[in-house]
Design a protein with these regions (language model features):
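Short loop/turn segments that flank or connect secondary-structure elements
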Residues: 1-154
Length: 154
């Protein structure tokens, strides 16, 4: 599954702290079994088990352990959760929605221009949406402001 993700839009970020360093406010990215196995080919001891078959990347001092020298050291194999951010999928009243977190770091219109790429990715991940949406690791994210972009029909 090829998706460059949204990180390319963050290159002009004016924040002194990168989102990969804000896990006191954000939740550590979720990773699937497949992502865990892929990363495990190169690294060990990098995840915590959240639920059966659902894992999160470890953090140290609120920073992703793969964020080194202002770069992602696993960029080419980074988890889907990282590729999607600041988009996310939430469940409300038994419906699923694509949302965009309101970031104060850049103009959200830049992210809205990525909708074709994101919609294509959403189609590919539909089989796993129910497994990964609104799990217990969503607790910090629920306090973040967001806009609902569209309903996702599963």
């Amino acid at each position: 599954m090829k998706c460059d993700g949204t990180f390319k839009n963050c290159t002009n970020c004016k924040k002194s702290i990168n989102c990969c360093q804000e896990f006191n406010k954000l939740n550590a990215p979720s990773i699937s079994i497949e992502e865990k196995e892929l990363i495990n080919k190169y690294y060990s001891n990098f995840y915590d088990e959240l639920e059966k078959n659902i894992f999160t990347l470890k953090t140290k001092n609120n920073t992703c352990i793969f964020f080194k020298n202002n770069n992602c050291s696993i960029y080419n194999i980074r988890p889907l959760d990282c590729r999607l951010y600041p988009y996310d999928i939430i469940e409300k009243e038994e419906k699923y929605f694509l949302i965009l977190y309101k970031l104060n770091c850049i103009n959200e219109n830049i992210f809205l221009n990525n909708m074709n790429e994101i919609n294509s990715l959403i189609e590919k991940i539909k089989p796993w949406i129910k497994d990964f949406t609104n799990k217990s690791n969503f607790s910090k994210m629920i306090n973040q402001e967001y806009v609902i972009l569209r309903e996702i029909l599963i």
